[in-house]
Design a protein with these regions (language model features):
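C-terminal nucleotide
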Residues: 1-116, 126-158
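Active-site pocket scaffolds in enzymes
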Residues: 122
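A short, basic/aromatic helix-end/turn motif that makes direct DNA contacts
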Residues: 119
Length: 158
């Protein structure tokens, strides 16, 4: 992937909670290679064609250095994840801490959007910040007010 000339400023947040990754993956894998109910068909479609399109759109946003679009795509991806995955394993995918971070008003002012990382749940979140100063402010807020560990990551730039 060609990296943008202007960096994208991301913040990775460790939610500091436990999750059962094997259970989460097992619940999603039941929809493959074929599925026999509406919930499974939603997961199958979401992890197939829908996800391919979203990833292609995200690659375009990264190449263009378009943080606002990337943030919106991440937010939309999380909403789709919630719609499709949560019914498969509510105990793991409801993720109240993740959703509290993603819905935090202070972070919303500093970030274009975000989503969970990996197979979801209460592991980590990634946020696309509006700029470097916003990322630094978001990191300070996450550490001092939310009491969570976080790490800034720049993608691209020279």
């Amino acid at each position: 992937i060609a990296l943008p000339k202007m960096p994208l400023h991301l913040l990775v947040v460790d939610l500091g909670k436990d999750k059962d990754t094997p259970l989460m993956l097992k619940s999603l894998q039941r929809s493959f290679p074929c599925c026999d109910d509406d919930c499974g068909r939603r997961v199958h479609s979401w992890l197939g064609e829908e996800n391919q399109q979203r990833v292609a759109d995200a690659v375009k946003a990264v190449r263009a250095g378009d943080a606002e679009t990337l943030g919106a795509l991440m937010t939309a991806a999380q909403k789709d994840f919630d719609r499709c995955a949560t019914p498969e394993c509510p105990s793991q995918f409801k993720a109240p801490t993740l959703h509290a971070v993603l819905g935090d008003e202070t972070l919303a002012e500093l970030c274009w959007g975000g989503k969970g990382i990996g197979c979801g749940g209460e592991g980590s979140a990634q946020l696309v910040c509006r700029d470097e100063a916003a990322r630094d402010s978001a990191a300070r807020y996450v550490r001092e007010e939310l009491g969570m560990w976080c790490c800034g990551v720049d993608v691209g730039g020279s």
